[in-house]
């Protein structure tokens, strides 16, 4: 009886092993889906995509990885992969070469000069590069069994997920528009963050961008030793960024800003809807000034006095808000209905993007910190189409500042420096321009506490805000440009051996009849063929006869374009070749 039981148990074990051998491939896919399900929020729907494991493995082993990228250099490149893999043991991505592999661009060793692409939107930062290791697909036979990710993946780095300015400027805005750059990606993609940070203080904001829970690099190790993405996009669009942080040259606005307030406000509208924040605005007579209160450093020492003075000057109530004491949804709700936002310089001012049109931003700077040298929020507020007023106030009184030399270096302490350097910093009246990120004089000054000089602040605000601050309904402010003028032609007449006239005429751009434009002018460039210079004219009518310096029997080149409201310059029509 005992031997029979043992024999039966062994037989069951053998049969189980045989069955396992036949089903193990499908269970690899099931395992991944179970792991991903654990990472989802309770409200997240089940995945629409499932992996046929044997088929996926066959495609990878025979065909290999496929890559096609957009962008000419590593700083503006986004790549689309099929069957890109990631080794959790080596912590590197793998491109498997198979029979149908494609690698565009095929850079050879230039792929390492310095990288294929930037994983974050901070341009050309040597901690943010993406690359992969190459292997023949046949190497898969000697590697751990791959686990296939069923979701479309967007793979990127967050730059600094604990700082709200970096979260919005470097991550959320670029993620939002990268997801919309490719059809369907916003509704299908799962975000994979590979920089190695933990969730950070604002992880809930990243969750708003996709219906699927984002995954961190550390979580990938629980899914398998070798992960393979059936479909992945790698990199982020930098087109929405407006500021550079001073890694190569002192910080300031980007040289070529490509985003306007229109795109910022569409993103802000999306975020407020996801946060369930109302757009109704405040009733007439209940407008308020919102003051950001900091609780740990860079304090406003006379905050109560400031609140009272603002209320008296502008005849509206004042409200305080802080990131520490309010949910982010409450912060957005208060900012999006405020008439004026007042704050010390700091990451919380990125919430300026939620202010209503016509509102005012007042940024306060501690002693010795020049507002002209630190302008991420000014640049944001002044983007075309944001329609905000911006005010910068600087404490000019050393007696109104409280310093903290005894703190750790990263909170502005300077006691670790030699005495001569400490003395120099204490006597300095302005922090000189500097690179990011550990300049001790900058850290010492930016972490000061400030007693705001109320009269000088009110005077500074009043230079910009003449009446009662507050949101206002505005007409479309983003400039619409004219098209080309149409049917441009020229006619010449000669009077004697030395006198000639050249008449140029054209029709209005066809889109003008659909627009309400305050002022329409035309710019005409006149150039004698063979000369290097031209003569420009600004004209109000659609035709003009030129007589000055017009020579008989001469060829002239003529360009004409339309201008709206003095600043919106349309394209030149095709060049006219006119013979007198």
Swiss-Prot record:
Effect ascribed to mutating residue 253 to L: In MDDGC8; no effect on protein expression; unchanged localization to the endoplasmic reticulum; decreased protein O-GlcNAc transferase catalytic activity
Enzyme Commission no: 2.4.1.312
Tissue spec: Highly expressed in the brain, muscle, heart, and kidney in both fetus and adult. In the brain, highest expression in the cortex and cerebellum. Highly expressed in the pancreas.
Compartment(s): Endoplasmic reticulum membrane
InterPro entries in UniProt: FN3_dom (IPR003961), FN3_sf (IPR036116), Glyco_transf_61_cat (IPR049625), Glycosyltransferase_61 (IPR007657), Ig-like_fold (IPR013783)
Membrane topology qualifier: Single-pass type II membrane protein
Pfam families: Glyco_transf_61
Family indicated by similarity: Belongs to the glycosyltransferase 61 family.
Disease: Muscular dystrophy-dystroglycanopathy congenital with brain and eye anomalies A8: An autosomal recessive disorder characterized by congenital muscular dystrophy associated with cobblestone lissencephaly and other brain anomalies, eye malformations, profound intellectual disability, and death usually in the first years of life. Included diseases are the more severe Walker-Warburg syndrome and the slightly less severe muscle-eye-brain disease.
Name of the featured protein: Protein O-linked-mannose beta-1,4-N-acetylglucosaminyltransferase 2
């Amino acid at each position: 009886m005992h031997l029979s039981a043992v024999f039966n148990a062994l037989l069951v074990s053998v049969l189980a092993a045989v069955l396992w051998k036949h089903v193990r491939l499908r269970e690899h896919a099931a395992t991944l889906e179970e792991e991903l399900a654990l990472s989802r929020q309770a409200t997240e729907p089940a995945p629409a995509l499932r992996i046929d494991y044997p088929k996926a493995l066959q495609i990878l082993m025979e065909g290999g990885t496929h890559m096609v990228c957009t962008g000419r250099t590593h700083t503006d490149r986004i790549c689309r992969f099929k069957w890109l893999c990631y080794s959790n043991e080596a912590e590197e991505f793998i491109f498997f070469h198979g029979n149908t592999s494609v690698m565009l661009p095929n850079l050879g060793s230039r792929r390492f000069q310095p990288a294929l692409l930037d994983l974050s939107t901070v341009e050309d930062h040597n901690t943010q590069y993406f690359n992969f290791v190459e292997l023949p697909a046949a190497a898969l036979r000697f590697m751990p069994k791959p686990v296939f990710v069923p979701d479309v993946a967007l793979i990127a780095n967050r730059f600094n997920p604990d700082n709200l300015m970096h979260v919005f400027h470097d991550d959320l805005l670029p993620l939002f528009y990268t997801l919309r750059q490719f059809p369907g990606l916003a509704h299908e993609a799962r975000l994979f963050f590979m920089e190695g940070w933990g969730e950070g203080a604002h992880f809930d904001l990243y969750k708003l961008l996709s219906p699927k829970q984002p995954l961190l690099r550390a979580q990938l190790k629980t899914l398998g030793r070798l992960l393979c993405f059936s479909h992945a996009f790698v990199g982020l669009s930098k087109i929405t960024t407006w500021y550079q942080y001073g890694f190569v040259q002192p910080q300031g606005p980007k040289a070529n800003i490509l985003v306007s307030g229109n795109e910022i406000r569409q993103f802000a509208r999306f975020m407020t809807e996801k946060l369930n924040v109302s757009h109704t605005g405040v009733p007439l007579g209940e407008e308020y000034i919102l003051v950001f209160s900091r609780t740990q450093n860079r304090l406003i020492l006379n905050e109560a006095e400031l609140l009272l003075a603002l209320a008296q000057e502008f005849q509206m109530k004042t409200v305080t808000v802080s990131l520490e004491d309010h949910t982010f949804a409450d912060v957005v709700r208060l900012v999006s209905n405020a008439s004026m936002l007042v704050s010390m310089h700091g990451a919380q001012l990125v919430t300026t993007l939620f202010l209503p049109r016509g509102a005012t931003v007042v940024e306060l700077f501690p002693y010795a910190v020049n507002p002209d040298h630190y302008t991420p929020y000014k640049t944001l507020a002044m983007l075309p189409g944001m329609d905000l007023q911006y005010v910068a106030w600087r404490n000019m009184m050393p007696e109104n500042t409280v310093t903290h030399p005894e703190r750790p270096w990263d909170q502005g302490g300077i006691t670790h420096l030699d005495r001569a350097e400490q003395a120099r910093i204490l006597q300095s009246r302005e922090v000189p321009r500097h690179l990011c990120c550990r300049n001790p004089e900058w850290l010492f000054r930016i972490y000061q506490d400030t007693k705001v000089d109320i009269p000088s602040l009110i005077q500074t605000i009043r230079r910009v805000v003449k009446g009662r601050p507050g949101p206002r309904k505005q007409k479309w402010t983003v400039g619409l440009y004219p098209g080309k003028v149409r049917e441009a032609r020229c006619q010449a007449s000669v009077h004697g051996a030395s006198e000639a006239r050249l008449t140029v005429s054209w029709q209005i751009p066809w889109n003008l009849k659909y627009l309400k434009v305050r002022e329409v002018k035309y710019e005409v460039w006149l150039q004698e063929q063979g000369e290097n210079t031209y003569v420009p004219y600004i004209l109000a009518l659609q035709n003009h006869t030129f007589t000055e310096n017009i020579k008989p029997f001469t060829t002239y080149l003529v360009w004409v374009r339309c201008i709206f409201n003095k600043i919106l310059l349309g394209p030149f029509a095709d060049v006219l070749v006119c013979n007198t």
